[in-house]
Amino acid sequence: MSSTQISAWNAAGTWEERGHTIWAKARIEELVTENGTFELVGGNGIDADARVRIVGVKSCEGDASVVMIRGKPRRGFDFELTLNWEAAFASGGDDDEQDVIIKGTVHVPEFSRDGVEDEECACEVKVSDRNSEHAPRENTCVATLKKRCEDFLVRTLMTIDSELEERASK
């Protein structure tokens, strides 16, 4: 039975909800980790080759569903996300020195269909275990994510919305 069809118990076709949360959570993680790599804002000199990238989803709470109302599918999703990010910088010193790895999170309080319609998705960027020795690099990572992450998240929202619409019509 396709999701545009109604189940036997709902022969009148007034209302029926189908969950797509498991699919949406997996798809969000796939999209953000595959596409979440950004060149540093103002990256130059020794750090010119550095990138900041989303490495995983720390938490993803919420749901996604398609609701059939009088035979018409209505899709919706609403999640709260916390994404892990990291950036690696060459040590710039002796070959024996370790690269500098900076890590943090991007918190997205509302990753929902409303963001698609409004074309916005606010986020908060944090650095884990700040180190004054690496403050300029940490600040560059935060600035990069603040500048580039909203557009990236809106594109991801649009992809999820479009794919959920396809799932609703099957």
Provide a role label for each language-model segment.
Residues M1-R27, L31-K170:
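Long protein-protein interaction modules used by eukaryotic assembly/scaffold proteins
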